[in-house]
Amino acid sequence: MTLEEQTFDLIRPPEWKGGVIFASPHSGRHYPAWFLAESRLDPLLLRSSEDAFMDRLIASAPDHGAALLTARVPRCVIDLNRGPEEIDPLVVSCAPPVALSPRIMAGLGVIPRVVSQGRAIYDGPMSQAEAERRIACFWRPYHRALAGLIDESVARFGGAILIDMHSMPRDALAHLPRPRPDLVLGDRNGTSASPRI
């Protein structure tokens, strides 16, 4: 199995319509043995960081003319929805200095320090070489595939519509009155999509 096959599944539709791409960067649940040996948590606790079964929810997208890119590598191994520079200095020893965003400070950088409820994944920091290996082996292939789909869509259709799928833990919506929404559409406060979409 190639690294790309370990990182993601890419399913193209029989007929691509309108440049729609569904992606699920946090649905990976194929835990490498080396990672399980390094983690201080049991596999069930590690799974709490997944957007569990999101890939199955959108599995029929290709049948409706959309491309589908889903993660196989778990979010707690590497977060495909972060920038490669978002390195937590508490996870990676001798990490290059970066601006500490709220996500990094919360332990949710490109290589997460914690899973849900702040449970630490590791007993101590990993080497810079290990962090670079994960980024090269998992993060870069996923983003090459995603960029390739977007570029192809722009060339064929004049644009691309990326629908990046995530689930939310119950406690993230606890502040909302009941009934809580079944679906939340986000556009990064109007910065990632045209209002027409």
Q: What is each model feature region?
A:
Residues 1-162, 167-197:
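N-terminal catalytic or cofactor-binding beta/alpha core of small enzyme domains
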